[in-house]
Amino acid sequence: LDIAREAAKAASTTRVEAEKALAQRVATQTAVTKQEGAEKELVKQAAAEKAAAEKELAQKVAAEKAAAAKLLAEETYHAIQDANSAAAELAKLRRAAAQSLTALDRAQARLTAAQSASEQAQAELVAAEEALSATDADKAAAAKEVEARRVAAKGAAAKVAAEKAATKRAETQCRAADASVAEKRAVCRAAQDRAAQLHAEALGGLPPLSSDQWDYAKARHLIVRAGFGGTPDEVQQLYEMGLHGAVDYMVKFHDHPVANIEFDPFRLERPEPWESRLEPDVERRALRDQRRNRERRQQAELRQWWLRRMAESPRPLQEKLTLFWHDHFSVQYQDLYRTYMLYQQNQLFRTYGCDNYGALLRGIVHDPAMIRYLDNHRNFKNNGNENLGREILELFSMGEGHGYTEQDLREAARALTGYNYDASAEQFVFLARRHDETEKTIFGRKGNWGGDELVTLILEQPATARYVASKLFVFLAHENPEPEVIDRLVHVIRAGNYDLQPMLKNLFLSQSFYSDRAMATHIKGPVELLVGVIRDLGLASVEYRAVDSAATQMGQMLFEPPNVAGWEENRAWITAERILARYNAVANLVDRPNTDIVGLLEGKGLRSSQEVVDYLIRTCLSAPPSDAKRLELVTFLGELPPPERWDAQRIELNARLRALVAAIFSMPEAQLG
């Protein structure tokens, strides 16, 4: 019984302790629950504060942009009105001066005639006085006539003097009007500078260059980097536009004509049904080889068509960025064997490459060439292929190892299941039954995401704007930019919802773009070099098949990048083998019978060998050579005949000048842009 009582007592004690433990656990759980509730409330409050802050920031940016835009409109309007009024006044004064000069010429002619008549009358008077047979009446008449002519001559002289004074006054007024126009143009430039400064500050962009720092060298830098180059006349025209006008001219190219250079590719030819009945197999192979040869020829024609567009298009920035995106979204023809697909992709880059990166990225996930190249036509639910999903994040949008996880890569691939193409039409198709419609978690967000939603999620990630801004800056300006420079470009890109034109304008107006780190520091790729020679010299009737072959020998065959990461840039272009190929390619391009260097020089007021060498250096180089190298070029050219004899010696002179240009382009400075 005692044992039972002890056991009961122990059980009671255990129960009490258990109840206490349970009560403590309940209390702890309650406290945890309260803490979780409080934390959730804090998270909710933080999210609300973040949303409010973002809203306030957006409103502030919008207000600043509106204020900057208003100030820009007011200052620019008044400055332009003043400049236009001054220009009209100057034109009026110049017309008056021209009329005065014409009247002066007529009066001068009358004075000359009167003086001649006076001299003749004087001679007649002397003759009359000396004539013994002359009567007094005749003498008086002759004297009267002479006096009348003297009076007329004196009146004509007075009139000429008055007209000279009027002309002098008109010239003074013209000079004053010129000064007024220059002053008002300076006011206009100052207003444009102020507006650009306010706009950059409102967007958080790069500080702009002052218009006073704009010169010919910077105009050439702009036309080389935002395009491929240009003749001295084209560079001079850009310089005379001023900084803001030149940048607008390059960036707002949709106002320019479209290059009238057509290419009409055919889709991949497929065997006809009757070919299967041919005997022996050698006949079928012969037909297959014929189709392959036609496809290869078409691919070569596509490369030559694009080279011609780059060299002749009135929209050089459009073609320059088409080349950039072609390298960024790399696809190899040898893995596709489909020219039509690559033509479509090239047009995609041309259409969206200067407009909106988001639209371009959406185009890529629907692009038949990219889908086939990265095997997304084999990416189905329950049987996935991660190639496109991986490269979309690693190479095309965010950069390797920035802002995503391996889980995000796998989920991105699932979002792209069913994104396919029709092999016959070579167009995008969505296979709904092959698409994975289950929930996916990408960047921590859950949903039944597809390819279009994937692009939206990518664009929301901070790493995306930074990656795009960095790659464009390095391509257009210089390598290894400072982080704060990229930060500012990121602000502009995100403020414009990935619209690239505001970012490009901010970059091309910026101090960073015209810094010593940027000017004449970029080693041109083979295509940039060859197209630049064509544009710098204004070459006509170019054999683009030879240009294509030369670019290939120099290491850059269009539509055949070495891998999905594209070509290695800058110093990778310069090897012992490739540098020799570069010299030979440029020499062969320049040294053709129809390359008329004399025509490039005519009408420029050049007479001496030194002047010709200096002009061609400005034509071909972004960075001047040393004095010693310049002297070598002058010695190489030798003495020149007078310009009036150039046409008669055109053939011989062109041969000498072509050799000189080839020598200039073989200099190390010619490899830089």
List each model region and its residues.
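Active-site substrate-binding loop specific to GH73 endo-beta-N-acetylglucosaminidase modules
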Residues: 201-204, 285, 299-306, 338-541, ...
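N-terminal accessory alpha/beta regions
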Residues: 230-350
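Extended amphipathic alpha-helical heptad-repeat regions
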Residues: 1-201
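Flexible, low-complexity segments enriched for small/polar residues
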Residues: 210-214, 220-231, 461, 465-496, ...
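Surface-exposed interaction patches
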Residues: 320, 345, 369-370, 615, ...
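Solvent-exposed, amphipathic alpha-helical "stalk/arm" or coiled-coil-like segments used as scaffolds
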Residues: 220, 299-304, 318, 322, ...
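N-terminal leader/transition segments
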Residues: 200-226, 230, 237-239, 243, ...
